[in-house]
Amino acid sequence: MLMAVDIGNTNIVIGFLEGDRIVGSYRITTKATHTSDEYGLMITQFLALSDYTADDVDDVIVCSVVPKVMYSFRASLIKFLGLEPMVVGPGVKTGMNIRLDDPKTLGSDCIADCAGAYHTYGGPVLVADFGTATTFNYVDSSGTIRSGFITTGIRTGAEALWGQTAQLPEVEITQPQSILATNTRTAMQAGLYYTFLGGIERTIQQFRKEIDEPFQVVATGGLSRIFKNNTDMIDVYDSDLIFKGMAYIYSRNVK
């Protein structure tokens, strides 16, 4: 069994894969203060919840955009599973060509998302990831990543809103019942949701304006689910996209 780990700024997402089948996935809060033992205990518990043990894990692949966490997490894998993880980055074959000014600056999570989208749904494809940051990456029909787009994630924007104002409360990030809000909380929810949704749709429109060939839009990320019922500009929602990409990358690097 392959264990795939996405270490993001807000969450660490762990998936267990039997071939192409995802047999379990778990999400925990990213904390730089967690020790390797704490991460190891969490991994052990997640394995047990999926009716597995450490002996069932044959290999581990990791995407990380948080270097401070990577050190202790890697140590937990070595101590509790006896495995040195494959880390998506320089020296690892991804199967994707990257035509950016500086390919090294493209996050490993974005690369895995693009690999998952291209090798699952084909190209050309615009890959949207709604996480701590919102990213769009365009992959052409040959599997080449040709552009990147980065902006604030909806939760990051929301935290700035209530964190930088004296009287606005923290609210749940969710789809409101109506844009016609009647109190402060629902007004904030409507404002955040529809402003962000409008930004998503306008961004996709601009990509379509500047790209000569038709393409599909594949969305992923923890908050993509709240937009799926309110726009027809996204073709596919795939919460497991990064796991699919990591599994593909792993397959290209093992004999």
Swiss-Prot record:
One of its GO terms (cellular component) is cytoplasm. It catalyses: (R)-pantothenate + ATP = (R)-4'-phosphopantothenate + ADP + H(+). Belongs to the type III pantothenate kinase family. The lineage of its organism: Bacteria, Bacillati, Actinomycetota, Actinomycetes, Bifidobacteriales. K(+) binds at residue 129. CDD domains: ASKHA_NBD_PanK-III. Its EC number is 2.7.1.33. The keyword Disulfide bond does not apply. Homodimer. GO terms for biological process: coenzyme A biosynthetic process. It comes from Bifidobacterium longum subsp. infantis (strain ATCC 15697 / DSM 20088 / JCM 1222 / NCTC 11817 / S12). NCBIfam families: baf (TIGR00671), PRK13318.1-4 (NF009846), PRK13321.1 (NF009855). It is found in: Cytoplasm. This is Type III pantothenate kinase. The active site is at 109 (proton acceptor). Catalyzes the phosphorylation of pantothenate (Pan), the first step in CoA biosynthesis. One of its GO terms (molecular function) is ATP binding.
